[in-house]
Amino acid sequence: IRDSFLTYWTVFMSTLLNLEPTMLIAAIFAVLHVIFTLRVGGYRFSNNISLGDGGDKELLNRIRGHGNFIEQVPIALVLLLLNDLNGLSDMAMYTLGGVLLVSRIVHYLMITTRSLPMVLRPLSMIGTLGTILVSAFLLVF
């Protein structure tokens, strides 16, 4: 009985802790967070602005790009983790994570550089909020 319990427990724990999709997605977003933070901090340092935006439009855009990222990504990552723990397929996890990643990068670029077609900004929010809503829906149904 002891050996069968240990075998069952080992299989259960290895399945439960098989969170590669979430770990990869979270790691990518962690790197983006550091990059976006350094873009704000570096600009502050080079322009001697320690608090607020100092009336600098470029700094304001960088602050809001980073802030919007921080406002949206944590809840999405929590929902993705819960779906991963709930057994959502790796393909579905990578699809949701990929949509979120592309959406967040495009949205950040739209806020900070405005170098992409304006139609992409609302589309990037649709991708972000869609990922959040689909992830929530999958947890309930």
Q: Residue ranges of each PLM-predicted region?
A:
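Juxtamembrane boundary at the C-terminal end of a transmembrane helix
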Residues: 136-141
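Core segments of transmembrane alpha-helices
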Residues: 68-80, 132
